[in-house]
């Protein structure tokens, strides 16, 4: 006989889950939710028949889980249905754009006999932006107004960035990235996309002359904190905001449709040339640390930027470095 835990592991392996780790905290789950990272979060609980006694460590796990896993929270009710629950949770986690799916696993469901591994469940296939949306945005671009494309989420990967760079080369739109992208591919040979500044005063300057802002898997920018006498919403009052593609849609297909609509499909994208900032000298400063990273980093480096204000110059200093991935705060 196979118990619930054994059948669960077989289901996870068959679904392509390759990394499992034990974790007692929740802060990274908050980051995963904000970053739209596909995570299956399995939380142990008391045996189903023990819950009614309200033991010392009993808690309402579903309520706590919804804070970081609003799209999918489920408590497994039996060993026989556990693996189907798990397969559906994995599909939910993988649904575009990605989310934390929480499966609560009571002890007796885990140790009970009769577990049956389940086949993987395919997540829904994302759809591109509809024709009416694409045509409305194409018309806005053709108007000649100062236009910026604000990119976020999964749009900051090479295929979508190249598509956006074609649009920029053809139509003169400005490319901007959200302040703290989950992951952005950068470096020589890729389009350079300027990140929106962390400080609201600087972000406001970047957006000052923008008359039309097109959102690509991104939200309209707001300040990180409220300040007396200053606006929280950073988009200029006279700027029109258009959403090309929402996080749960097909980003690349939507950008390609827009390029077709404005005639940018064959445009040659502008790419970042290779350039190192030079080896820093003198007294150690945050800027010189950023410069050293840009000078010495090898190809395919993964930068995990937790410097916040100390890393303000990091994007500039690494722009022409060999190709790399940058992961930021979410």
Give residue ranges: language-model regions.
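N-terminal alpha/beta PP-like core and its mobile active-site loop of ThDP/TPP-dependent enzymes
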Residues: 1-266, 296
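Active-site diphosphate/adenylate-binding microenvironment
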Residues: 5-9, 13-18, 23-26, 270-330
């Amino acid at each position: 006989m196979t118990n619930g835990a054994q059948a669960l592991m077989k289901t996870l392996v068959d679904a392509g889950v390759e990394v499992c780790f034990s974790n007692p905290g929740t802060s990274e789950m908050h980051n995963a939710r904000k970053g739209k990272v596909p995570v299956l979060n399995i939380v142990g609980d008391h045996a189903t028949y023990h819950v009614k006694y309200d033991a010392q460590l009993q808690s309402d796990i579903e309520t706590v889980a919804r804070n970081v896993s609003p799209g999918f929270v489920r408590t497994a009710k039996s060993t026989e249905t556990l693996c189907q629950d798990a397969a559906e949770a994995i599909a939910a986690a993988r649904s575009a754009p990605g989310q934390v799916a929480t499966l609560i696993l009571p002890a007796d469901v885990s140790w009970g006999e009769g577990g049956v591994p389940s086949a993987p469940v395919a997540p829904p296939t994302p759809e591109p932006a509809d024709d009416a949306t694409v045509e409305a945005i194409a018309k806005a671009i053709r108007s000649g107004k100062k236009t910026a494309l604000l990119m976020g989420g999964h749009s900051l990967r090479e295929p979508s960035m190249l598509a956006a760079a074609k649009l920029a080369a053809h139509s003169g739109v400005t490319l901007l990235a959200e302040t703290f992208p989950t992951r952005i591919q950068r470096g020589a040979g890729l389009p350079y996309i300027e990140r929106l500044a962390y400080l609201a005063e600087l972000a406001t300057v970047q957006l000052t002359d923008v008359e039309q802002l097109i959102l690509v898997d991104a939200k309209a920018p707001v300040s990180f904190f409220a300040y007396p006498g200053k606006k929280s919403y950073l988009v200029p009052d006279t700027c029109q905001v258009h959403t090309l593609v929402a996080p749960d849609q097909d980003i690349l297909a939507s950008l390609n449709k827009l390029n077709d609509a404005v005639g940018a499909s064959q445009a040659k994208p502008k790419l970042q040339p290779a350039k190192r900032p030079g080896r820093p000298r003198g007294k150690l400063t945050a800027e010189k640390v950023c410069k050293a990273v840009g000078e010495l980093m090898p190809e395919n480096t993964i930068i995990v930027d937790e410097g916040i204000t100390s890393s303000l110059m990091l994007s500039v200093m690494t722009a022409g470095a060999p190709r790399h991935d940058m992961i930021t705060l979410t």
